[in-house]
Curated annotation (Swiss-Prot):
UniProt-recorded name of the protein: Protein RnfH
Family that this chain belongs to: Belongs to the UPF0125 (RnfH) family.
InterPro entries on file: Mopterin_synth/thiamin_S_b, RnfH, RnfH_sf
Highest taxon of source: Bacteria
One Pfam family linked to the record: Ub-RnfH
C-alpha cells in the first residue's frame, strides 16, 4: 500500500525574486521536514532554514519541528527585518511634525 501524501506550498521572497512551490509530502510531516524536502535552501544559498522564522498563512510557527502539516497549508519563510518598525514609525512621525510646523 502506498504511503499517504498531502500537498502543501512553500513560499519565500528575497529582494530579487519570489518562489512559490507546491510539494507532495508524506502525511504527518512536520514543517521542518517539509522545508528540508523543499530544497529552498538550494534555490537561495543565503537562506539558513534552521534559523529562519516560518509561519503558516501568516501565523508564526513556534516550533517547526513539532508542528504537523495539514493538506493545503502554505509554509512561509520569513526574512529578518532590516530596520526596527518602532524606529521607522518614530522617524515618520517626526517628519510629519516638521512638515506641520514649517511656515508657508
Amino acid at each position: 500500500m502506498a504511503e499517504a501524501v498531502i500537498q502543501i506550498e512553500v513560499v519565500y521572497a528575497s529582494v530579487q525574486r519570489q518562489v512559490l512551490m507546491t510539494l507532495d509530502v508524506p502525511a504527518g510531516s512536520s514543517v521542518r521536514q517539509a522545508l528540508a524536502l523543499s530544497g529552498m535552501d538550494r534555490e537561495f544559498p543565503e537562506l539558513d532554514l534552521a534559523q529562519c522564522a516560518v509561519g503558516i498563512f501568516g501565523k508564526v510557527v513556534a516550533d517547526p519541528s513539532t508542528r504537523v502539516l495539514e493538506a493545503g497549508e502554505r509554509i512561509e519563510i520569513y526574512r529578518p527585518l532590516l530596520a526596527d518598525p518602532m524606529e521607522i514609525r518614530r522617524l515618520r512621525a517626526a517628519r510629519a511634525r516638521e512638515k506641520r510646523t514649517l511656515p508657508g
